[in-house]
Amino acid sequence: MAPNETVFRRDLPLAGVYGCVQTHGLVPLLIRLVTRSPFDHVFISTGGGQIIEAEPGGVRIRDIAEYAGCRIEYNTGEPMTDIQRAAVAEYASSKRGEPYAWAADAVDGLRCLGLRWRILARFERARRSVMCSELAAQAGQYAGLDWNCGQDDPCQVTPAMLARRPGMQPGT
């Protein structure tokens, strides 16, 4: 098996675990280049092979098998209680249908390039949409976990930041 190849089992990952994934395409490649990370997307497992994620089109539930062949790392090495895992999955599921935050992706890109204007923070807080890493950070907050990666607000968290947290392990 190649080092970046992921084997999928329907019983993994556990509910409440987030996964950082390296997807295919031009936009994901640009995200990885700007954030200097091998990962460009984040999802949350709801168990039974199902995940919830913020993507173009909004927050939706999908099957983990859609990422077969993609490199994935999960935060399975992070200590969490069953109650915290359930809370993460519950929160993420409650956001189903919420719009995707295209503008937030642009703001994150500007930040990664070194632009940190105050107006960017005001813009982020005023929106009513969510991006993938923000959804994970918010779900962590809801469960009493600090997944903000040192940022003041979940809307400032990127997939790269979540992937660099302790406890990340290759998907199995």
Positions of the model-derived regions?
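N-terminal capping segments
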Residues: 2-40, 47, 52-56, 60, ...
